[in-house]
């Protein structure tokens, strides 16, 4: 669920297996632009723009007096928190189901981690999802929250909000559509 893998076959020079030279040449040709700074500069620009969009959204929501609780104290999510300079001023706390994390704080951003049950009792205006790669599971688990007026914010892969008006469509589309 949290990664990928490569399948590699190696053989000696006297092996009956022959490498697919056409495929190898095509891969090397396709990867040629990666030897320049262009793709990396474009990626960097997109990351900066996206992190500014996330930060602005959270600042705007907080300026309106709304409550925001993070959802899922994950390593990937913590990278987003630190890159976007998100701290307890923007996200009051983070809900997680792992009891070993409760009462601890996120590295760098210093946001306290609480049980999901406590988050549900607090009824925040927004949940900011830090485990976006579990898109369907989050929506399924928090359907009642959404149907009672809560809003779920996914910052990645693109910033979007799920509410009771678009819940069914977003659930049907799934993570891959973003």
Predicted feature residues:
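Short internal beta-strands
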Residues: 92-97, 153-155
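Conserved nucleotide-cofactor-binding alpha/beta core module
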Residues: 99-105, 117-118
């Amino acid at each position: 669920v949290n990664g990928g893998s490569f399948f590699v076959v190696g053989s000696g020079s006297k092996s009956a297996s022959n490498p697919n030279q056409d495929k190898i040449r095509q891969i090397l040709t396709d990867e040629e632009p990666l030897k320049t700074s262009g793709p990396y500069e474009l990626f960097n620009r997109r990351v900066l723009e996206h992190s500014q969009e996330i930060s602005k959204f959270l600042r705007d929501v907080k300026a309106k007096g709304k409550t925001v609780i993070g959802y899922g104290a994950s390593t990937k999510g913590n990278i987003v928190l630190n890159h976007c300079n998100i701290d307890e001023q923007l996200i009051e706390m983070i809900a997680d189901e792992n009891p070993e994390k409760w009462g601890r704080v996120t590295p760098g951003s210093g946001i306290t981690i609480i049980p999901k049950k406590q988050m549900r009792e607090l009824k925040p205006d927004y949940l900011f999802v830090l485990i976006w790669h579990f898109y369907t599971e989050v929506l399924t688990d928090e359907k009642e929250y959404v149907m009672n007026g809560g809003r779920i914010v996914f910052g990645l892969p693109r910033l979007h909000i799920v509410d009771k008006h678009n819940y069914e469509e977003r659930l049907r589309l799934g993570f891959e559509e973003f």
